[in-house]
Design a protein with these regions (language model features):
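Cell-wall glycan-active module
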Residues: 2-12, 26-223, 230-263, 336-416
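Glycine-rich (often Gly-Gly/Gly-Pro-rich) flexible segments and glycine-rich loop motifs
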Residues: 244-290
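Short secondary-structure capping micro-motifs at structural edges
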Residues: 209, 270-273, 309-313
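Bacterial N-terminal signal peptides
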Residues: 16-28
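Alpha-helical segment that forms one wall of the substrate-binding/catalytic cleft
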Residues: 139-145, 278, 282-355
Length: 416
């Protein structure tokens, strides 16, 4: 699960990445600064209160885009250390012991760029002669490996979850980078407010809990992605579930039916769109809008400009595509927990959650975390939940996991 430095709640760029998987919602982002590539000098960053008559709570002394090398002592004190079980070299084992290459390819035979996809796509508008196996098993493993090298620290002023700064830690290099900061984070008023911090170790993906729960996590992750990228229908050859992971671009955006550049003017100063580049939905979570491309670029590369200048990377490189999905899966967005915490049974519902019917940790609640628009739906014909749950049942069966009694739909649930 995401590792918490305190029993705190955090929001992943409050109002910036509030899209549900597959349904990007335009919400005006906060005014902030974001990282472009920069090398900085070592600075002694303090996260405790300074006493000068009244408490003055100081955040990072780095400027946005600046980085510093950390000693092991710094990492222990400021980042809760680095757990060797969650390092990148454990990623290959983490995936392979849960789902084999053969089973993965049998579950998704028509995935984008597979031999079966080429037969289906031949002569179609979307056919690409050079299409690679985007959702390949190796790309999944590479993504799990690469995200395992990243920790994220989200800090906000107490009572103001939108007043944030975000730091990224490269574990192997022991380099910390300040990737984003609200413009008013260190205002005179806000400096009087305590700093609330959450630390997320992306290396915990597929590596926490009993083996059954780790299998359920991979199944839930792939089931939700398969639904969002599915190309099947009820009478599709081989069955609808064999058509998961078929698409990786929003069709209207790709074909130009929707010509929007998907640049939100309110965030353009922070995450400027590049001329002739369009930020329509790409990848397994259909990453959309300039502010999301810039933010995810900052987390993956430590530089907002990589994906702002080259948004097509998300749909061209399957490893990067899977990385965007894992980052989204692992990160809580107050008041929502992360899907990771839910599926491995680390999330404990609050009284408010229980009142909304959000009381049974399982696949159904991961749907609510990812897309609250699918509340109160059962596994009935025409329901999006039917296909999500169908994929989950199919994958867990392949894994040999018994999910009897697990709530896999959203009946009786309201959004967080």
């Amino acid at each position: 699960m995401p590792q918490w430095s305190k029993l705190l709640s955090g929001r992943f760029i409050h109002r910036t990445i509030c899209f549900s998987v597959g349904v990007a919602l335009l919400v005006t982002p906060i005014t902030a600064s974001a990282a472009s590539s920069s090398n900085g000098k070592y600075q002694n960053v303090q996260f405790a209160a300074e006493q000068s008559g009244k408490a003055n709570f100081q955040g990072s002394l780095l400027t946005v885009g600046e980085n510093r090398f950390l000693t092991r002592s710094n990492i222990e004190k400021e980042w809760d250390g680095i757990d060797p079980d969650y390092k990148p070299d454990q990623a290959v084992k983490a995936v392979k012991e849960l789902l084999s290459l053969e089973d993965y390819e049998a579950l998704f035979p028509n995935r984008l760029g597979s031999p079966a996809w080429y037969e289906i796509a031949k002569g179609k508008e979307y056919f690409k002669a050079d299409q690679k196996d985007y959702f390949s098993y190796s790309n999944l493993i590479d993504a799990v490996t690469e995200v395992a090298n990243i920790k994220l620290k989200i800090s906000h002023r107490k009572g103001s979850p939108g007043v944030q700064e975000i730091n990224r830690l490269d574990k192997d290099a022991r380099i910390e980078t300040l990737v984003s900061r609200s413009s008013d984070f260190n205002s005179a008023k806000n400096k009087k407010q305590e700093i609330v911090t959450v630390i997320i170790d992306f290396g915990t993906f597929l590596k926490e809990g009993f083996k059954k729960d780790r299998k359920r996590e991979l199944a839930a992750f792939l089931a939700n992605l398969a639904h969002e990228t599915g190309g099947g229908w009820s009478t599709a050859p081989g069955g609808e579930l064999k058509w998961g992971l078929f698409w990786n671009e929003n069709i209207a955006g790709r074909t130009g039916v929707n010509t929007s550049a998907f640049v939100d003017e309110a965030s353009a100063a922070l995450y400027p769109g590049v001329k002739d580049k369009r930020y329509y939905g790409r990848g397994p979570i259909m990453l959309s809008w300039n502010f999301n491309y810039g933010l995810f670029s900052s987390i993956i590369y430590g530089d907002k400009n990589v994906l702002l200048k080259n948004p097509e990377i998300v749909s061209a490189d399957g490893k990067v595509g899977f990385m965007t999905a894992i980052l989204f899966w692992m990160t809580p967005q107050d008041p929502k927990p992360s899907a990771h915490d839910v599926i491995i049974n680390k999330w404990k519902p609050s009284k408010a959650d229980i009142a909304k019917g959000l009381s049974q940790p399982g696949f159904g609640i991961t749907i609510m975390v990812l897309n609250g628009l699918e509340a109160n739906l059962g596994e009935v014909e025409g329901s999006s939940v039917k296909r999500r749950a169908g994929h989950y049942r199919d994958i867990t069966k392949t894994m040999g996991v018994d999910i009897t009694g697990e709530k896999v739909d959203t009946l009786g649930m309201k959004p967080f």
